[in-house]
Amino acid sequence: MSYRVKRMLMLLVTGLFLSLSTFAASASAQTGGSFYEPFNNYNTGLWQKADGYSNGNMFNCTWRANNVSMTSLGEMRLSLTSPSYNKFDCGENRSVQTYGYGLYEVNMKPAKNVGIVSSFFTYTGPTDGTPWDEIDIEFLGKDTTKVQFNYYTNGVGNHEKIVNLGFDAANSYHTYAFDWQPNSIKWYVDGQLKHTATTQIPQTPGKIMMNLWNGAGVDEWLGSYNGVTPLSRSLHWVRYTKR
């Protein structure tokens, strides 16, 4: 091989490496960095409220911006209300940016009532032009002495793990967390490891989301919602540590 050919190959390889490095850096820059957010006020640079639509299927309510509010106690409150007979409005808050591997923590109290769910999770999906990847911390209002962990990778779930807490989560604030890494997800309650997953781990960065909603057609999972309103769940702070 001549010197000129070798030189051209070296330049091509170097150019490809630089292009890939630039792409990787760009992809990394598109995800959010570490933050700690106490809910003393609503930070529109970090969060956005779902408003005016329903997820349909098992979600038996319409997301309303008014159902995401801040209290004088330094809390974010997500509410489930009824504007008219058998119609329900619910609350969902989500991050503006997407976030990747790292430690996700929330200090919160779920709502307590049969047929409802209080969630903290990461999500991305087809409407974002990505696979459906999701990592969940969920409280089923029918029994808030337990927490459910779950995750989806390219739409494949069925990884549910229900953990007995030893206390009623609806009565006081506790910290729930998951540490998402390329080869594992570890879930924590008040700093204590409760569950680890190591297979089919999600790879796609997603938005940080939190919501309160009532279900329909999933009575075996949630119990039959009895129409009680208003209901609310509270969040004191959220923290993300990129790593």
Curated annotation (Swiss-Prot):
Disulfide bonds: C61-C90
GO molecular function: licheninase activity
Annotated EC: 3.2.1.73
Effect on the protein upon substituting E160Q: 15% of wild-type activity
Keyword Signal included in the entry's annotation: yes
Catalytic site positions: E134 (nucleophile), E138 (proton donor)
Biological-process GO terms, alphabetical: carbohydrate metabolic process
Keywords: Disulfide bond, Glycosidase, Hydrolase, Signal
Documented effect of changing E92Q: 3% of wild-type activity
Stated consequence of mutating D168N: 60% of wild-type activity
Top EC group: hydrolase
UniProt-listed Pfam families: Glyco_hydro_16 (PF00722)
Annotated phenotype, changing D136N: 0.5% of wild-type activity
Chain ranges of the GH16 domain: 29-243
Signal sequence coordinates: 1-27
The family this protein is said to belong to: Belongs to the glycosyl hydrolase 16 family.
UniProt protein name: Beta-glucanase
Species assigned in the record: Bacillus licheniformis
